């Protein structure tokens, strides 16, 4: 056991992706008036909560991770950390993260983090991931919480913008996850995990990917139409979303499903990154947007 194991088991890549969306929500609510001390506390607090959830997930999935090529080298599978130590580590990370959000931000942001944590660890990892084709749908709620946490840490209000962020990022999770399940089809089959491509076929997953990307595109526009983001954000959201939709539609004539799914997955990362950045740099008040439309 080494320091490397303590880092690896938290899934740093997932933490980094969540930090981007936290920042997007935070700067969207800040509207150019950024409290950097609060920002740092929110980023660290959310990262600790996400890390905690990932460690618990590693503990829960250790019996199926060894069956999958993608996860067979994880710390718990390789015996790099004992189960009791991992559980203690996960608990300490969670307590630290929730406490930081509650004390340095506000109870609302801590509550949002708690909901995401319960959904991911309890409903998804412990239950639905292994039992239901709808596990991805339920799990998407946890993946959508980080931008909401960032937004509520500033606004201290679960308003229309928070709802829009929750819907946007939940919808984004679905095609993103289905694409992974397609190009990792053999892994999920070997572990007997009933993701949509395994349970109902790749064609069914392709149809769902197109529908969810379309819904995502429409949802992204609501931040501008609702008066929370500017026209620059709108232009980027529309361009990225429509190209992602075009790419998703291409799945119907793809000769290599795995190659196509990897492209859809890769562009999903670019899309959510671009939107997170634009939410921060082009946030504005409803009055600003209305004045722009009126000119």
UniProtKB/Swiss-Prot annotation:
E.C. number: 2.5.1.141
Reactions catalysed according to its record: heme b + (2E,6E)-farnesyl diphosphate + H2O = Fe(II)-heme o + diphosphate
GO-annotated cellular components: plasma membrane
Alphabetized Gene3D superfamilies for the sequence: UbiA prenyltransferase
PROSITE patterns named among the record's database cross-references: UBIA (PS00943)
Recorded topology in the membrane: Multi-pass membrane protein
GO molecular-function terms, A-Z: protoheme IX farnesyltransferase activity
Pathway given in the UniProt record: Porphyrin-containing compound metabolism; heme O biosynthesis; heme O from protoheme: step 1/1
Broad class of where this protein is predominantly found: membrane
GO biological process: heme O biosynthetic process
Residues that span the membrane, as ranges: 9-29, 36-56, 83-103, 108-128, 135-155, 163-183, 209-229, 230-250, 264-284
Pfam families: UbiA (PF01040)
Compartment(s): Cell inner membrane
InterPro entries: Protohaem_IX_farnesylTrfase, UbiA_prenyltransferase, UbiA_prenylTrfase_CS, UbiA_sf
Keywords associated with the record: Cell inner membrane, Cell membrane, Heme biosynthesis, Membrane, Transferase, Transmembrane, Transmembrane helix
Domain of life: Bacteria
Function: Converts heme B (protoheme IX) to heme O by substitution of the vinyl group on carbon 2 of heme B porphyrin ring with a hydroxyethyl farnesyl side group.
Protein family per UniProt: Belongs to the UbiA prenyltransferase family. Protoheme IX farnesyltransferase subfamily.
PANTHER family found in the cross-reference section: PROTOHEME IX FARNESYLTRANSFERASE, MITOCHONDRIAL (PTHR43448:SF2)
Note: Carbon 2 of the heme B porphyrin ring is defined according to the Fischer nomenclature.
Name of the protein this chain belongs to: Protoheme IX farnesyltransferase 2
Annotated organism of origin: Pseudomonas putida (strain GB-1)
Gene: cyoE2
């Amino acid at each position: 056991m080494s320091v490397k194991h303590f880092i690896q088991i938290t899934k740093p890549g997932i933490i980094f992706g969540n930090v981007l969306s936290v920042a997007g929500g935070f700067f969207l609510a800040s509207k150019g008036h950024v409290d950097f001390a609060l920002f740092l506390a929110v980023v660290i607090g959310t990262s600790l909560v996400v890390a905690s959830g990932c460690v618990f997930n590693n503990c829960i999935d250790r019996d199926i991770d060894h069956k999958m090529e993608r996860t067979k080298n994880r710390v718990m599978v390789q015996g790099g950390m004992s189960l009791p130590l991992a559980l203690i580590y996960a608990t300490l990370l969670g307590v630290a993260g929730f406490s930081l959000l509650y004390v340095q931000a506000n109870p609302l942001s801590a509550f949002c983090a708690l909901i995401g944590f319960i959904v991911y660890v309890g409903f998804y990892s412990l239950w639905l991931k292994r039992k239901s084709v709808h596990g991805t749908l339920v799990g998407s709620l946890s993946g959508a919480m980080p931008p909401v946490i960032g937004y509520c840490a500033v606004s201290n209000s679960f308003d229309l913008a928070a709802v829009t962020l929750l819907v946007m990022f939940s919808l984004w999770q679905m095609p993103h996850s289905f694409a992974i399940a397609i190009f990792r089809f053999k892994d999920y089959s070997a572990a007997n995990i009933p993701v949509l491509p395994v349970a109902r076929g790749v064609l069914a997953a392709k149809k769902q990917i197109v529908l969810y990307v379309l819904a995502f595109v429409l949802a992204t526009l609501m931040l501008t139409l609702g008066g929370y983001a500017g026209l620059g954000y709108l232009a980027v959201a529309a361009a990225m979303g429509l190209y992602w939709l075009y790419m998703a539609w291409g799945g119907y004539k793809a000769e290599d499903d795995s190659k196509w799914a990897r492209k859809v997955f890769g562009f999903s990362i670019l899309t959510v990154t671009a939107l997170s950045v634009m939410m921060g740099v082009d946030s504005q008040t409803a009055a600003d947007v209305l004045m722009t439309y009126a000119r």
